[in-house]
């Protein structure tokens, strides 16, 4: 695993080096990252962790598309998977809250890429849930927005998360 700063050469080098790229940048920075990484992302699994929020912290896209789908259009050679956007950062290392696993969703059109991300979610400790095709990112992004609104807007804090109960 390699963390990348904001230097353009570091972004290009890391994109070329990695098999899987986790895109955890502000939504407004996606175009610059795509331009900077260029074709180095072709053939890679790109995990879109972004939340499609505008500068005023409102949902930037509706239910006719998603940030992940728009990213896939910009990176036609990549295998985009929407994941981790519904989880606050402090829970990323264990996937748990108070000893209970949080749910992490993964939506994508490439079965192998999605299986890779689901395996990573399970390895971290999340209850990994296949959320279907990439178009279901249209539902995951508003869920991430709800989490942000509960945590920050309604001041419930970030020591919270979602858990899907199923049999």
PLM features: what roles do these ranges have?
Residues 3-5, 57-61, 127:
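Structural/interface elements that position substrates and couple domains in central-metabolism enzymes
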Residues 102-167:
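Active-site-lining helix/loop region of Rossmann-like oxidoreductase modules
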């Amino acid at each position: 695993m390699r963390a990348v700063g904001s230097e353009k050469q570091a972004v290009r080098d890391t994109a070329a080096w990695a098999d899987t790229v986790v895109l955890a940048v502000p939504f407004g920075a996606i175009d610059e990252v795509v331009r900077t990484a260029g074709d180095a992302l072709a053939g890679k699994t790109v995990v879109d962790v972004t939340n499609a929020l505008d500068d005023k912290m409102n949902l930037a896209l509706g239910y006719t598309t998603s940030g992940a789908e728009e990213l896939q259009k910009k990176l036609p050679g990549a295998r985009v998977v929407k994941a981790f956007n519904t989880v606050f950062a402090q829970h990323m290392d264990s996937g748990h809250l108070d000893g209970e696993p949080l749910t992490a969703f993964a939506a994508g059109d490439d079965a192998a890429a999605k299986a890779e991300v689901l395996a990573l979610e399970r390895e971290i400790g999340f209850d990994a849930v296949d959320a279907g095709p990439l178009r279901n990112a249209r539902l995951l992004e508003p869920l991430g927005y709800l989490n942000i609104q509960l945590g920050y807007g309604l001041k419930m804090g970030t020591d919270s998360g979602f858990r899907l109960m199923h049999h």
